[in-house]
Amino acid sequence: MTNIRKTHPLMKIINDTFIDLPTPSNISSWWNFGSLLGLCLIMQILTGLFLAMHYTPDTTTAFSSVTHICRDVNYGWIIRYLHANGASMFFICLYAHMGRGLYYGSYAFRETWNIGVILLFTVMATAFVGYVLPWGQMSFWGATVITNLLSAIPYIGTTLVEWIWGGFSVDKATLTRFFAFHFILPFIITALAIVHLIFLHETGSNNPTGIPSNMDKIPFHPYYTIKDTLGALLLILTLLMLTLFAPDLLGDPDNYTPANPLSTPAHIKPEWYFLFAYAILRSIPNKLGGVLALLLSILILAFIPMLHTSKQRSMMFRPFSQFLFWMLVADLLALTWIGGQPVEHPYMIVGQLASILYFLLILVLMPMTSLIENKLMKW
C-alpha cells in the first residue's frame, strides 16, 4: 500500500515541501535562515494576535493599553517583549538570508529573488506601521517624519501625505489605519512567502559552490529537519535571552514617553534595522534626492541579477569579490552606526562617504571585479 503522505492531496504538498524534497547535500548553516524566517513569522503572528486582543488603536488610550498589557494582562509583558524583540530577530535573519543570497549567487533564481525583494519591502512596511502603535514619542515623530517624506513627490506629494494621514497631521485616523495595515500585512507576507517557496522548489536550492547539484541530492527529512531544529533552538534561545535579560536593549527610551505633538525629541531615529537606510536618506541635503536614495538603497537589490558579470555563480572561489562583499557588510554596519548619531560634523561626512561607497560597491566595483576575475581564470 502507498504511504498516505504521498497520496493525500494536502499531505502530498507538505511531503513534497518538508519531507521528500531533494536537497543539495552540501548546503551550510547559511541556508538555515529561510526556515528561521518562517518561524519568526509564526511567532510574530501569534504574539501579535494576543496583543491585538488587548490593544486599543485610539490616540487617547493606545499608550495606556500597552501599559495595561504589560502590567495587568497575564504574561502580557513577555508577549509584548517577545513581539518587539521578535521583530529584531526577524530582521537579523532577513539580513543574513539576503547576505547569503548575495554571496552565493542565489539571485540567479530571478523569480524567487524578486519575490524576496517584494517580501523585504512588505516586512519593512509592517515593522514601520507596527512601531507607530504604542503611541510613544518616537512612534509619533517617526510616523510624522517618514510619512512626510512623500511630500517630496512633485505635484501630488502634499495631497498624498494628507490622504495617508487621514487629516492635516498624524492623528486618530492615522493610528487606526496603521493598526489595520499592521494586522493585515503579516498575512500578505505569509502568502508571498508561500509563492517564494513555490518558485524556489521549481528550481531546487542553490549550494555554496554555485554548481548544479542534481546528481547529489538527499531528502530534506531527516537531514535538514534536524539541522533546522538546531537553528530554531538557537534562535529561540537568543530571543529569550534578549527578552528576559535586556528587553529594552534595542528599543528607544523616548518611546516610554507618551506622544506629544508639541514636543519634538532631540534625536528622531527609527529602530536599529532601518538605521542604514535612514543614514543614506540623511546624507543627501536635498529632500527629493534623499527620498530617492532611500528608495534606491533597497530597490537596488532587484537589479543585482542584471549586475552579475562573473562566469561563476558563487563567490566561493572569487577572493576579490569576497573582499568587496565583506567591505559592503562593513559599510552597512558603519551606516547603521551613523544613522543613530546626531547630524553633526564628523558623522555627516562619514555618512556621506559610506553612502557613496554603498552604491559604488554594488553598481561599479563588484561588477568590474567580476570581469577582472573572469580574465584571471584564463591565466
Curated annotation (Swiss-Prot):
A Pfam family of this chain: Cytochrome_B
Top-level taxon of origin: Eukaryota
Subcellular location: Mitochondrion inner membrane
Keyword vocabulary terms for this entry: Electron transport, Heme, Iron, Membrane, Metal-binding, Mitochondrion, Mitochondrion inner membrane, Respiratory chain, Transmembrane, Transmembrane helix, Transport, Ubiquinone
One GO MF term: metal ion binding
Residue sites binding heme b b566 per the record: H97, H196
Binding site for heme b b562: H83, H182
Record's keyword annotation contains Heme: yes
Note on how the cofactor is bound: Binds 2 heme b groups non-covalently.
BP-aspect Gene Ontology terms: mitochondrial electron transport, ubiquinol to cytochrome c
Record InterPro entries: Cyt_b/b6_C (IPR005798), Cyt_b/b6_C_sf (IPR036150), Cyt_b/b6_N (IPR005797), Cytb/b6-like_sf (IPR027387), Cytochrome_b (IPR030689), Cytochrome_b_C_euk/bac (IPR048260), Cytochrome_b_N_euk/bac (IPR048259), Di-haem_cyt_TM (IPR016174)
Family from the record: Belongs to the cytochrome b family.
Protein name in the entry: Cytochrome b
